[in-house]
Amino acid sequence: MMEGLSPASSLPLLLLLLSPAPEAALPLPSSTSCCTQLYRQPLPSRLLRRIVHMELQEADGDCHLQAVVLHLARRSVCVHPQNRSLARWLERQGKRLQGTVPSLNLVLQKKMYSHPQQQN
């Protein structure tokens, strides 16, 4: 993990975090392996269509936040595990694939619904 950022390297990251586009908002930095912030807003369908694969980041050991990491072609986006738009998308994917949903999707859905907090 990175120990710290210089002010010059923090500015581009800050600008990305303030960007309204979710795919640019919280990219997973290539030099780290853990999400440090989570995207909590509804996910646009154009972003969901571009998912190459997903993984679940557990809040244990090296990483301090539980997150769903959406890997796109050129970047990764860290999403809150209870994001409602992600849950709806996973549900639609499950219906579309009719029982062939990868086990990760089932694990994600189980974890999302095991903590009944209000989330987008």
Swiss-Prot record:
Organism, scientific name: Mus musculus (Mouse)
Pfam families: IL8
GO molecular function, one term: chemokine activity
Tissues where the protein occurs: Isoform 1 is predominantly expressed in placenta and weakly in skin. Isoform 2 is predominantly expressed in testes and brain, weakly in kidney and liver and even lower in heart and muscle. Low expression of both isoforms in other tissues.
SUPFAM superfamilies assigned: Interleukin 8-like chemokines
InterPro entries to which the protein is assigned, alphabetical: Chemokine_IL8-like_dom, Interleukin_8-like_sf
Gene: Ccl27
Gene Ontology cellular-component terms listed: extracellular region; extracellular space; nucleus
Organism domain of life: Eukaryota
Leader sequence segment: 1-25
Entry annotated with the keyword Nucleus: yes
Job of this protein: Chemotactic factor that attracts skin-associated memory T-lymphocytes. May play a role in mediating homing of lymphocytes to cutaneous sites. May play a role in cell migration during embryogenesis. Nuclear forms may facilitate cellular migration by inducing cytoskeletal relaxation. Binds to CCR10.
Gene3D superfamilies on file: 2.40.50.40
S-S bonds: 34-63, 35-78
Protein family according to the UniProt entry: Belongs to the intercrine beta (chemokine CC) family.
Any Gene Ontology biological process: regulation of actin cytoskeleton organization
Phylogenetic classification of the source organism: Eukaryota, Metazoa, Chordata, Craniata, Vertebrata
Keywords attached to this entry: Cytokine, Disulfide bond, Nucleus, Secreted, Signal
Subunit structure, as described in the record: Monomer, dimer, and tetramer. Heparin avidly promotes oligomerization. Interacts with TNFAIP6 (via Link domain).
Protein name as catalogued: C-C motif chemokine 27
